[in-house]
């Protein structure tokens, strides 16, 4: 019987799930909107909501707790500075999930998870490490 089992396994080990959601939460905080499968979005939502609540409360111990969950110091800084200030008057409900059709390859249901009142300029900003062109051309 499945009584009392509230989270989806998503066909992954516990370590893989934890790492995946840490990466997804960091990406969501960085870009303020990501596209993923619907079950992953539904599982990610409470994780991010709790992180934003930590950011709103502030304090060194809660910042360290957020770092241990997110594993990204830059996104924790954004969480505790920008997002905490933005949602200081909102009592929960910081994210929304919008269904986005089905994926072409396997027909998986897709969804967009984004922050309510998000900064539209944050999407696509600094999308990852980029190699220096000057170093490769100088050789």
UniProtKB/Swiss-Prot annotation:
InterPro entries, alphabetized: Ribosomal_bL17, Ribosomal_bL17_CS, Ribosomal_bL17_sf
Keyword vocabulary terms for this entry: Ribonucleoprotein, Ribosomal protein
Example GO molecular function: structural constituent of ribosome
Disulphide bridges: none
A Pfam family: Ribosomal_L17
Entry GO terms, CC: cytosolic large ribosomal subunit
GO BP terms in the entry: translation
Coiled-coil regions listed in the entry: none
Family assignment from sequence similarity: Belongs to the bacterial ribosomal protein bL17 family.
Subunit structure and binding partners: Part of the 50S ribosomal subunit. Contacts protein L32.
Entry protein name: Large ribosomal subunit protein bL17
Gene: rplQ
């Amino acid at each position: 019987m499945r009584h009392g089992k509230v989270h989806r396994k998503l066909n992954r080990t516990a370590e893989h799930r934890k790492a995946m959601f840490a990466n997804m939460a960091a990406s969501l905080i960085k870009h303020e909107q990501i596209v993923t499968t619907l079950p992953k979005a539904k599982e990610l939502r409470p994780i991010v909501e709790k992180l934003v609540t930590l950011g709103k409360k502030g304090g060194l111990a809660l910042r360290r707790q957020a770092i241990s969950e997110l594993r990204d110091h830059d996104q924790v800084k954004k969480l505790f500075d920008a997002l905490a200030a933005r949602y200081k008057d909102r009592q929960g409900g910081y994210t929304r999930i919008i269904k986005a059709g089905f994926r072409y390859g396997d027909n998986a249901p897709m969804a967009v998870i984004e922050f309510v009142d998000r900064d539209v300029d944050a999407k696509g900003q600094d999308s990852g490490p980029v190699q220096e062109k000057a170093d490769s051309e100088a050789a």
